[in-house]
Amino acid sequence: MPVLSTDTARLNGMPKPSAATTPFHLVYGGDSYLNDQTVRDLKHEAQRRYPDAETIELDATNADHYAFDEAVSPSLLSERSIVIVSNLQNADDKLGETMVAYCKQAVNNPAEASIVICQHEGGIKGKRLIDQLTKAGAVKEAVADLKKADAKLN
């Protein structure tokens, strides 16, 4: 089953991928408030779907691949977790490789996967990781950039 971006899914009349149906999300760029709001919406949707899941927040600036592996692994308290990774653009190579490997695994077996929601500020820093994760099956949620007055009205 091909994973479509949210824009492609809407154009084809398909439902928008959600935290309940897709284990790996990338919230990319745009207005910082809307970016944060998109992450919160995905997190709340995942918490409604999996009320017993533990929510873990990581900052890619100082998190390593061991912390990510531990966050997505089952714990004594719950079988799955909801992992929020902020500042994805600052992830080191080893963390990026670990995330890509987990994304491939999670997309192939979503019923047992933890939910991962990554937040990227946009720009070219970390673009290679975004491309690798998208290719591995992550759903990219591109956030609107409100630089023009017309965009702010909507």
PLM features: residue spans?
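Non-catalytic interfacial helical region
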Residues: 2-15, 19-25, 30-154
